[in-house]
Amino acid sequence: MENSVKMDNSGNSTPLPQRQRRANNQPNKNIGKLGPQKQNEGASDGGPAEKRQRFGPNNQNGGGGSVVGGGGGGGGGGGQNQNKNFANKGGFGGGGNRNRNRGGNQNRSNFQNQNQNQKSTTDAPKADGGNLNDKSNEANNANQSNSNSAAQAQAQLQAQAQAHAQAQAQAQAQAHAQAQAQAHAHAQNQAFRARGGGGGGGGGGGGGGGGGGGGGGGGGGGGGRDRNPDRRGGGGGGGQNSGGGNNSQRGDDFFYSQRLRSISGPTHELPPIEVAQETKFSGRNRLYVGNLTNDITDEELREMFKPYGEIGEIFSNLEKNFTFLKVDYHINAEKAKRPLDGSMRKGRHVRVRFAPNATILRVSNLTPFVSNELLYKSFEIFGPIERASITVDDRGKHLGEGTVEFAKKSSASACLRLCNEKCFFLTASLRPCLVEPMEVNDDNDGLPEKALNKKLQEFNQERSVGPRFADLNSFEHEYGSRWKQLHDLFKSKQDALKRELKMEEEKLDAQMEYARYEQETELLRQELRKRESDNERKKLEWEMREKQAEEMRKREEETMRRHQTEMQSRMVRQEEDMRRRQQENTLFMQAQQLNSLLDQQEGFGGGNGGGGGGGGGGGGVGNSNFDNFGGNSNSPFEVFRGNNNSSMAGNNAGPGANNQQQDSFAAFEFGVNNMNQGGNQRGNNGGNNVPWGRRRF
């Protein structure tokens, strides 16, 4: 598939490092190639497949079968088999076998797969506008066709051998059964384990191609892998599912079950069956015509039976000289049987009989409550019914059996198969209906004298004596009595067996009722145990939910308690902060009041000096109040704290006029330690003269 990529232009480009060229390496063989063989160095250089490019850009082989297509490739001449071959698109006959072989598989089939499938690169490429390498490769291959004649001859011989093998495989697949076809395909493809096709019989959709027919299409024969999972490995003969067979039986069973479900339910009221007219060309009108010559034709048979009615289908077996044919109505069949049976034709006595009717079934083991309508409705699921009736005695009593006549033999066969494989119940009783073929003798003519062979010795011996009564105590009477006793014994045993069967049926009915009661009781017990277990489970779930709710409630209470505690502590802290702020506000108000008092004292300080020259003493007296306040160690003002100026009223005679010009607040100028005990108040202040800005609250 890489011929569009790997061209013979080694002189223009440097090839990739390859394995050393092997001696006597044959070129790649393209089986069934219709065009000239193109030489390809990429496939014959001895290099491994993984070293080369896996897929080319556009190389779909539409004509020749590649390495993997094999003997059956391409559907045997034109039908496209979608088997998903990405490396070798093409078949032997140009049908496009798309086997799912991506290259690298070693197809070791009988004839065609002698090369080890190193991803065939000699396929003829399609003409593509954007694929320039294909055109150059075609021009180059035209010059190299002379050097490839030996490979061409060998490929053609192998193609012929492959075509012969394919034709032989197809003929065998059509002539033999499924097992033989599969064995043949396996014998031709015993070493084929790759994912593609190949082999004489099919080769991944070869031979018949496309999932059926011929040499095992749809992945049959060669073991190809079809993309359709339902058609994988359809062997040899038929190519669908398992070679010749299909899943129609399984599908019919499914439809029967669907129809049965549609009528399952109470059957208390069933509509009456309309009496239909006689079906034309039914199974009851089928005649057997024997002892014919092998030169008879269908036209002669139609002319023979034409006076008695219309003739339907005719089946002739000239090797055994008999024929089956259908007359339109039963009365016409009877009319044709009487005169034609025993008639002479070309020196032979023609035998005309009613053919065995395989569409009539006998249904037994029925309960007394099964009517014609229920029997008809129950067996109608298998196919159209011509007649269904319950057998009764001369008094109209139910005999426990009936007959069902189908319109088709296939419906009767399906009914017989399913009723024998499974238990088919018509009512609530567990008595399954028993179905068996019923041979109906519609021949009312019996055995006429002309039908006997009078040339036999036994005939002459038996007919030598006529009818008679035996004398008492004679030889004939003795052995005649023994025959009667033998038949009486048979009848008595038959009656005893019937009575025993009746007793066993009644016993089985009683056991069935008891078993049904026990089974229903066991079902009730199981239901009770189930409900008890459900009750226990629900109780455990309820307790678990209650426990979870209790735990959640406790967690919520703990959370609320913790939240309340936090709120209380927060409120206590807020109250303490508020109380502290109130105290600070009170102290601040007191400080403001004191400041206002100090401001007032500063504004009216001259009046406190005692007036005039004698103000020294008066000032001292006036200052004594503040001295006591300042000496208080509990004062919040630093300016008054520790002021021990207590003897200002003593020797306070300054220089005269200078001392009187100062106000009486000289004691507040004002260190913490004013140790002026008796000296000049305005003169030497022993403390720190701190300004008013030193006040601290």
UniProtKB/Swiss-Prot annotation:
Residues 224-233, 551-565 have a biased composition (Basic and acidic residues). The keyword Cell membrane does not apply. Residues 102-118, 139-191, 623-635, 642-659 have a biased composition (Low complexity). Residues 488-586 form a coiled coil. Residues 1-29 have a biased composition (Polar residues). Residues 285-357, 359-445 form the RRM domain. InterPro entries: NOPS (IPR012975), Nucleotide-bd_a/b_plait_sf (IPR012677), RBD_domain_sf (IPR035979), RRM_dom (IPR000504). One of its GO terms (biological process) is visual perception. Residues 61-80, 195-223, 234-246, 603-622 have a biased composition (Gly residues). One of its GO terms (molecular function) is RNA binding. Keywords: Coiled coil, Repeat, RNA-binding, Sensory transduction, Vision. Residues 1-253, 551-575, 601-697 are annotated as: Disordered. Required for normal vision and courtship behavior in Drosophila. This is Protein no-on-transient A. The gene is nonA.
